[in-house]
Design a protein with these regions (language model features):
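Acidic, glycine/proline-rich Ca2+-coordinating loop motifs
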Residues: 1-275
Length: 275
């Protein structure tokens, strides 16, 4: 039997939050599980520190210098083997210049400043890797570590898929309808917005949606070489099939001592990878 204690525990139930991920771990070494919530769109992420009395305190602005703008997946694990867990979140920054130029639009400075002053905190469109200093205060090092840009990313998994003692990062990618396509916005959506107000005919949304481009993307498998140095080994590991991947999970499915991987795909069969 369960009782809903969300409000009394200090957990937000915001009408504007698009919560897509949650990760649980003891971030500050007090033997109490803390929570990290990844929120899509304009709402910032939430970091809840467990106070040990059934209460949580949301402290992201004072502990994280900035977070992903459109956070989707999230996971927590110790990536540098210092005993303190890091936080990793996924976003939508493309990893190549072509996709960067044709799919991304960034907010102007005055809008970013307005969001910050309205308590949305500093946000950046990239995967974020928050390095823990041992007291649950974090420095964002995603770009430095080479894990910031994986395109339209969903699932985030941190686990040792190489069995070398260093935890690695798996990111699932893909978007069935690439609504960020600048060509779609400039040459199709804008024309529809111009014509629709004067039209006396019923608008065909299904036809409109069919014009949105689809984008199969490669999943990423970042090998951890130690000292927070990562490289994408998806191709050499057999994990680079183009897909519309979102959810993913790992586990030793054949009891051979290493972790296998299951990846869900939209409108396509899932992937089952034996390690």
């Amino acid at each position: 039997t369960f009782t809903d204690v969300t409000a009394e525990a200090g957990i937000y139930s915001s009408d504007i939050a698009f919560g897509l991920g949650v990760a649980v771990s003891d971030l500050n070494g007090d033997n109490l599980p803390d929570l990290y919530i990844s929120n899509d769109f304009w709402e910032r992420d939430y970091l809840y520190i467990n106070k040990g009395n059934g209460k949580f305190s949301e402290e992201l602005p004072s502990r994280v210098n900035y977070c992903s703008t459109s956070s989707m997946g999230a996971d927590i694990a110790d990536l540098n083997n210092d005993g303190y867990p890091e936080v990793f979140t996924t976003d939508m920054l493309p990893g190549d210049n072509y996709r960067l130029q044709t799919t991304m639009a960034f907010d102007p400075y005055h809008l970013e400043d307005a969001k910050y002053r309205a308590n949305y905190h500093y946000q950046i469109t990239q995967n974020c890797l928050h390095l823990n200093d041992g007291t649950a205060n974090f420095s964002e090092v995603g770009l430095m570590c080479g894990v910031a840009a994986t395109d339209w990313s969903w699932g985030a998994l941190i686990f040792d898929f190489e069995n070398d003692g260093n935890k690695d990062i798996f990111v699932s990618n893909g978007i069935l309808k690439d609504i960020m396509s600048m060509d779609f916005h400039d040459f199709i959506a804008d024309q529809v917005r111009i014509r629709t107000p004067g039209s006396k005919h019923r608008f065909d949304y299904l036809k409109f949606i069919s014009n949105i481009p689809t984008e199969h993307l490669q999943n990423y498998a970042f090998s951890n070489a130690g000292n927070l140095k990562f490289s994408n080994r998806a191709t050499s590991l057999g994990l680079s099939q183009l897909s519309y991947s979102n959810g993913a999970a790992y586990g030793d499915l054949d009891n051979d001592g290493d972790e296998d991987l299951v990846v869900n795909n939209i409108n396509e069969k899932c992937f089952l990878y034996r390690n």
